[in-house]
From Swiss-Prot:
Monomer. The keyword Zinc-finger does not apply. Pathway: tRNA modification; tRNA-queuosine biosynthesis. It holds the Pfam family Queuosine_synth. The keyword Transferase applies. Gene3D superfamilies: QueA-like. Its main location: cytoplasm. This is S-adenosylmethionine:tRNA ribosyltransferase-isomerase. GO terms for molecular function: S-adenosylmethionine:tRNA ribosyltransferase-isomerase activity. GO terms for cellular component: cytoplasm.
Length: 343
């Protein structure tokens, strides 16, 4: 194992036409690249092959966060256009946001949204502005009336009605994410029925995915990278389900990198404990996993923290080899793309 990992170690060549721009007609119609760590093999399947790999007493853990229409468009009092991406809701009328304008807004300046809503900028923390909504309505009211789904930057089109349903898991419950937990997008009701028939248990954690998930790693050395913070919750019910799974010799299967980060944040010395709060856990090769036994995930951007996490879990050489095979076999990449299972 290398002592000094570089961001460049996680680069790979991806033809732009392999970046999925739209979802498949069938949620569960995607392909599945399966990595067996014990045999060091890579095989090609359909997504229903995921259920085939699940065993009785396994625990499937998903992220129930709900994507909010977090992109707002407005104007300054001077008339200049402003784009606002809500990163985190702090209260009914207060939130943190990324703001794009011809000139960085000053503290105390106003942004007008659709004539009825006025936002005052009250603070700045690095790239984020603290904003207050001056209205009898809540921030969620504003977003659901005037916001747009914040599609990832690599999807080169404007969102449409189809995205409102498809850039959202069918089990989304807790509003607060600005990006979807994409591994869960493959699940439909038939998937859950099949898992239950296999004798698997299902439970949910919450991690509100922030825009930081799309930010590049700017440090050359991974040791110098600082992760963005995201809010998460692992309940006592989840911890109890994990304990029961262990007692019955089952496996904990994380559906997505967000679930992986939740469970590994909440687990110390192989014991999962309830936790609600911030996580900035950065998982890369050399990390010692305490909770998760298998990972279902999508394909991730070159040099991203998500690819680093997958390499930590699956093994660097094996995962990078699998990515090369995925490119050669024309898999669909990123949020609306195909899936990978590592067990």
């Amino acid at each position: 194992m290398k002592n000094q990992w570089k961001t460049s170690d996680f680069d790979y060549n991806l033809p732009v036409e392999l970046i999925a721009q739209r979802p498949l007609a069938d949620r569960s119609g995607s392909r599945l690249l399966y990595i067996d760590r014990s045999r060091r093999t890579v095989s090609h399947r359909q997504f229903n092959g995921f259920v085939e790999q699940v065993k009785p007493n396994d625990l499937v853990v998903l992220n129930d966060t709900k994507v909010i229409p977090a992109r707002l468009f407005g104007h300054k009092q001077t008339g200049g256009k402003v784009e606002c991406l809500v990163e985190r809701i702090l209260s009914k009328d207060r939130f943190l946001a990324h703001i794009r304008a011809s000139k960085a807004p000053k503290l105390g300046s106003q942004i007008i949204i659709a004539d009825n809503f006025k936002i005052i900028i009250e603070g700045r923390y690095n790239d984020l502005f603290e904003c207050v909504l001056h209205s009898s309505a809540s921030i969620l009211d504003l977003l659901y009336q005037h916001g747009r789904i914040p599609l990832p930057p690599y999807i080169q089109r404007e969102p449409d009605k189809d995205d409102q349903a498809r850039y959202q898991t069918i089990f989304a419950e807790r509003a607060g994410a600005v990006a979807a937990p994409t591994a869960g997008l493959h699940f439909n009701e038939e998937t859950f029925d099949a898992l239950r028939k296999k004798g698997a248990a299902i439970t949910y954690v919450t991690l509100h995915v922030g825009a930081g998930t799309f930010q590049p790693v700017r440090a050359d050395s991974l040791a110098d990278h600082r992760m963005h913070h995201e809010w998460m919750e692992v309940s006592k019910a989840v911890c109890d389900a994990i304990a029961k799974c262990r007692k019955n010799n089952g496996r904990v299967i994380a559906v997505g990198t967000t679930v992986m980060r939740c469970l590994e944040t909440a687990t110390k010395n192989s014991e999962c404990r309830p936790y609600a709060g911030e996580t900035d856990l950065f998982i890369y090769p050399g990390f010692q996993f305490n909770c998760v036994d298998a990972l279902l995930t999508n394909f991730h951007l070159p040099k991203s923290t998500l690819l680093m996490l997958v390499c930590a879990f699956g093994g660097y050489e094996l995962v990078m080899e699998a990515y090369q095979k995925a490119v050669e076999n024309r898999y669909r990449f990123f949020s609306y793309g195909d899936a990978m299972l590592i067990s």
